Amino acid sequence: LARSIITLTTDFGSADHLAGTMKGVILSINSDAEIADITHHVLPYDLLDGALAIGQAYKYFPAKTIHVVVVDPGVGTERRPLLVSAGTHYFVAPDNGVLSMVYEREEQLTVRHITSDHYFLQPLSTTFHGRDIFSPVAAWLSKTWQTNAFGEEITDFVRFTLPKPKPAGKGVKGVVLRADNFGNLLTNLAAEDLPQVIAGTSFKMRVGNVEISKFAQTFSEGGPNEPVLLMGSSGFFEVAVNRGNAAKVVSANRGTEVTVEFA
């Protein structure tokens, strides 16, 4: 029998016991579960960063993987815990929009409000639902696969959309979504937004106060401190600096406007 795979995506960091405690809860309920960390370094309380992390990773896991996502600034409030069936994957997360990229990409969605509290750890804390709700629900689901046992289906779940690129003059205007650990700047510009760049048409890109005109295939193509545009592994264009930090070189971060113009 194939082992159940449960992934964890949180903003807990790795210095504290929180992520380890969640694993203990899961293994106490299903000792055969295989637990994979996607990341515990989502920016604290940052729902967009969490949505990007899970949105870019989940498809690379086998069918029937259960993804636990805990970026939960509203823990202990009225926000609902959710169990989501999306395509061939399952997600256990708070109802705060952190699954928005999953909702955007999957047409087959069933979203349930988790109300069956006999699956929760008791006494239920008001501050650590990752331990008391999301982990045990994921573990029990991995044993039973009975999604309807956890609560009723809902349609009014919270979701947000990524900012969309807009036409601007002879080009396109976009925005930086995040800077990764290397300082690479992930934009909201996808291949279909800039087919001319991929085809080799000359362009001028402005990020903050810096102009970029080089489209690279690899990180190593730029010179020292030379920002280049490249197609990232996530399907979005990125600004990068060879062995350097593009976010620092161009003084940009999330929300910085990006414009690409063609002659």
Where does each model-flagged region fall?
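Structural motif
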Residues: 4-7, 33-36, 65-68, 81-83, ...
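N-terminal glycine-rich anion-binding loop in soluble enzyme alpha/beta folds
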Residues: 3-41
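Conserved active-site and cofactor/substrate-binding residues in soluble primary-metabolism enzymes
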Residues: 17, 21, 30, 45, ...
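Anionic-ligand-binding alpha/beta catalytic cores of soluble enzymes and soluble regulatory domains
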Residues: 121-188, 193-198
